[in-house]
């Protein structure tokens, strides 16, 4: 895993490319059917599934938006419970979890280096799976890598905008 992560980070690539590789590795470590990255718009109270990897019967759709207030991820954060292998019992009123058939859920929030909340990195399965310290550590490591990459992309965009403004100003 470490070698693959190093190779992924060494290549200059898009956020999507990096995340897809990390989701695949996360699936192997967690033994979950689906792994996915979400972005949360706290003001609009919406959670958007940006990228998902589905390897078995469970299918978490990409480009799918759900109410943040009723999501498993928000409940996990609010209750400080980032793993459950009893989702139907613990969060049985969560419609999305029930419709997707989620039994086991693992999640971690993603905070950008400036401290702002970005979204979540999650893994889910319709089968009961055991908690693993290794899986949780990898999940948190990958969340940190994604946060760093997002921050890097934002800084590069700011530099491009500043450069364009300087060029435009030089013509005046």
Report each predicted region and the residues it spans.
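A short, aliphatic-rich beta-strand micro-motif
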Residues: 103-112
């Amino acid at each position: 895993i470490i070698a693959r992560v190093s190779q992924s980070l060494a290549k200059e690539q898009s956020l999507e490319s990096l995340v897809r590789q990390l989701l695949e590795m996360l699936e192997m470590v967690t033994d979950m059917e689906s792994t996915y990255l979400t972005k949360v718009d706290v003001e609009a109270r919406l959670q958007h599934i940006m990228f998902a990897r589905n390897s078995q019967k469970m299918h978490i759709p990409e480009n799918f938006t759900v109410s943040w207030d009723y999501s498993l991820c928000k409940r996990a954060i609010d209750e400080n419970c980032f793993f459950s292998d009893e989702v139907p019992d613990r969060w049985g009123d969560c419609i999305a979890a029930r419709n997707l058939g989620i039994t086991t859920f693992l999640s971690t929030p993603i905070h950008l280096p400036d401290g702002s909340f970005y979204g979540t990195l999650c893994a889910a399965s319709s089968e009961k799976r055991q908690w693993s310290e290794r899986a949780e550590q990898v999940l948190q490591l990958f969340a940190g890598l994604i946060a760093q990459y997002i921050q890097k992309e934002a800084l590069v965009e700011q530099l491009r905008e500043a450069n364009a403004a300087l060029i435009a100003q030089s013509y005046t």
